[in-house]
Curated annotation (Swiss-Prot):
One of its GO terms (molecular function) is glutathione synthase activity. Its EC number is 6.3.2.3. Keywords: ATP-binding, Glutathione biosynthesis, Ligase, Magnesium, Manganese, Metal-binding, Nucleotide-binding. Pathway: Sulfur metabolism; glutathione biosynthesis; glutathione from L-cysteine and L-glutamate: step 2/2. The lineage of its organism: Bacteria, Bacillati, Cyanobacteriota, Cyanophyceae, Synechococcales. It comes from Prochlorococcus marinus (strain SARG / CCMP1375 / SS120). This is Glutathione synthetase. PANTHER family: GLUTATHIONE SYNTHETASE, RIBOSOMAL PROTEIN S6 MODIFICATION PROTEIN. InterPro entries: ATP-grasp, ATP_grasp_subdomain_1, Glut_synth_pro, GSHS_ATP-bd, GSHS_N, PreATP-grasp_dom_sf. ATP binds at residues 146-202. SUPFAM superfamilies: Glutathione synthetase ATP-binding domain-like, PreATP-grasp domain. It holds the Pfam family GSH-S_ATP. The gene is gshB.
């Protein structure tokens, strides 16, 4: 069985930490034929989608074959694992992948859903599970919401890994100037959420496969910061799901599955849904290490069940 992984340049991947590397190594252990490429390697000739890809032996890391020009129809499964930002190049890649999808190739996650589920805005489908949230461009509306909530967090809609996330009080000096900056002079919407003090106890990353939670870690912010993202120095610790967190997964699971979002990471703070990560969820290595769960192998097992 042939699987294609669409990634950032392979040279940038740290196999000790990277979830895509973990998935490729699990696929290798399952005796699957693995290929890699970047979004720039995708193409369409008429109504047929193609790719310039290389074989990879990911364990031990790594051995690459020569580049070959192949039809995407040759692959049983294609993983779209390019990290954000979801820019024009990313969006065009999803359209090219839909050509293969229409020909019967399984694409994970579903291209149309990758476009539709912005990692900040997608959570609004489940707003009752979230902290009070406003998405707006107008400074006056954002200031009024901040006044109502007292202390808020600003999030750029296209950000990743906690980049650009700002904690601010409603009476902060220079708030107008800050809001003008983050909204590009009221031309770009931004997400504003009530600040949750429980973030100091951790931000839980829960990984769902086909709508079911298979593993989780708790991420603690580094000293002097409220952001717990591992990329910003947060520390991961072992954890179990609370009753509330299980309820959140049960609420989200059917929608994720029906939308073709096979592999998803959700973030929960103090029992409140924060984000739904669908593009290239991380955390596999940490779950495997801290929880002693062969998560990547379980993901591939669930995938192969689709072909049995």
């Amino acid at each position: 069985m042939k699987q294609l992984f669409i990634l950032d340049p392979i040279e940038l991947i740290n196999p000790a930490k990277d979830s895509s590397a973990a998935l490729m190594q699990a696929a290798h252990r399952a005796s699957l034929d693995i290929w890699v490429c970047t979004p720039a390697d995708l193409q369409a000739k008429g109504a047929k989608a193609r790719v310039v890809a290389k074989t990879i032996v990911p364990e031990p890391w790594k051995s690459l074959g020569e580049a070959q020009n192949l039809s995407l129809n040759e692959f049983h499964c294609i993983w779209m694992r390019k990290d954000p930002p979801v820019d024009e190049a990313f969006l065009y890649a999803t359209h090219l992948l839909e050509v293969a999808e229409r020909a019967g190739v399984l694409v994970l996650n579903k291209p149309a859903s990758l476009r539709a589920w912005n990692e900040k805005l997608g959570a609004l489908r489940f707003s009752k599970l979230m902290a009070p949230t406003l998405v707006a461009s107008r400074v006056n509306e954002l200031k009024e919401f901040a006044k109502e909530q007292g202390e808020v967090v600003l999030k750029p809609l296209g950000g990743k890994g906690g980049q650009g996330v700002i904690r601010v009080a409603d009476a902060a000096l220079g708030l107008d100037a800050l809001l003008e900056l983050v909204t590009s002079q009221e031309q770009m919407p931004v997400m504003m959420q009530k600040f949750l003090p429980k973030v100091i106890e951790g931000d839980k990353r829960i990984l769902l496969v086909n709508g079911e939670p298979l593993g989780a870690i708790n991420r603690l912010p580094k000293c002097g910061d409220f952001r717990s993202n591992l990329a910003l120095g947060g520390q991961a610790e072992a954890t179990n799901l609370s009753k509330r967190e299980k309820e959140i997964c049960e609420e989200l699971g059917p929608s994720l599955k029906s939308e073709g979002l096979f592999f998803v990471g959700i973030d929960v703070i103090g029992g409140m849904l924060s984000e739904i990560n669908v593009t290239s969820p991380t955390g596999v290595r940490e779950v495997e290490k801290l929880m002693n769960i062969p998560l990547a192998d379980q993901v591939i097992e669930r995938l192969l069940a689709n072909f049995s």
